[in-house]
Amino acid sequence: MEQFRNIGIIGRLGSSQVLDTVRRLKRFLLDRHLHVILEDTIAEVLPGHGLQTSSRKMLGEVCDMVIVVGGDGSLLGAARALAKHNIPVLGINRGSLGFLTDIRPDELEIKVAEVLDGHYLVENRFLLQAEVRRHAEAIGQGDALNDVVLHPGKSTRMIEFELYIDGQFVCSQKADGLIVATPTGSTAYALSAGGPIMHPKLDAIVIVPMYPHTLSGRPIVVDGNSELKIVVSKDMQIYPQVSCDGQNHFTCAPGDTITVSKKAQKLRLIHPLDHNYYEVCRTKLGWGSKLGGGGD
């Protein structure tokens, strides 16, 4: 197992609970004589921290591991910035759900110590890359760990588009939009739209129509190496948007083409050894527990 000596910390802004957890994490890491580097944005709200600071972009170059304190949204943003550096990322949950940031604050010292001592699991989660092209020229591009979503933006009108997979025409559709999700993102927006849950180890992409104006529109799961092309109808009166993880947005025009494919670099997501994906689903999604045993 890798030895982690230079630890970066990213924290969600605007939360006193996050700041308290970052301070606690900092003290714990320093007590273990590790080199701690704060992302510059969180460092600005921690006066007197006395630590090295770095931009998020540079953290991937100077750290052995990055710990994200926040919710899944915080980890999504960190993942897009750090995946290209092949650096392990660990999440401490200070959000509402915690599918990706799976260490509870009350077990911080115990679980982080286990990871630092080499007792951990690594999952390689792939990302999607999206590009919007207009008249054969790229006008926007972004990455997503969860999903790439075509949606009407502020408009309430439906979008008309054509879908192609690996150059083959699949369908034309009129809908509120289209969600293209990774296995990681299958428990996010895609799940709310009626998509299936996919295990993170699957090499697959799920395509989920949003409120299609048809009785036969259903999600479809395709090979993870597929290249998707979405062509926005030239006859539309609105300018839809493409969103990557709900955080980066691009405005499309009628006739634009959106391509979505797997990104070469993957996120190295660290979990404690007792991590159980099905337990996470059961806890976060409210699945039923085991039937209670009993006597006669």
Swiss-Prot record:
Task: Give the catalysed reaction(s), semicolon-separated.
Answer: NAD(+) + ATP = ADP + NADP(+) + H(+)
Cite the active-site annotation. D72
- What family is this protein classified in? Belongs to the NAD kinase family.
Gene3D superfamilies, alphabetized: Probable inorganic polyphosphate/atp-NAD kinase, domain 1 (3.40.50.10330), Probable inorganic polyphosphate/atp-NAD kinase, domain 2 (2.60.200.30)
Its Enzyme Commission number(s) read: 2.7.1.23
Matches recorded under HAMAP family: NAD_kinase
Q: Name one Pfam family in it.
A: NAD_kinase_C
Protein name per UniProt: NAD kinase
Which InterPro entries does the protein's record reference?
Answer: ATP-NAD_kinase_N, ATP-NAD_kinase_PpnK-typ_C, NAD/diacylglycerol_kinase_sf, NADK
Report the record's Gene Ontology biological process terms. Answer: NAD metabolic process; NADP biosynthetic process
Q: Which cofactor does it need?
A: a divalent metal cation
Q: Which organism is it from?
A: Pseudomonas fluorescens (strain Pf0-1)
The answer to keyword NAD applying to this record is: yes
Q: Which UniProt keywords apply?
A: ATP-binding, Cytoplasm, Kinase, NAD, NADP, Nucleotide-binding, Transferase
Which GO MF term does the entry hold, naming one? NAD+ kinase activity
Task: Give the chief site where it resides.
Answer: cytoplasm
Q: Which residues form a coiled coil?
A: none
Its lineage reads:
Bacteria, Pseudomonadati, Pseudomonadota, Gammaproteobacteria, Pseudomonadales
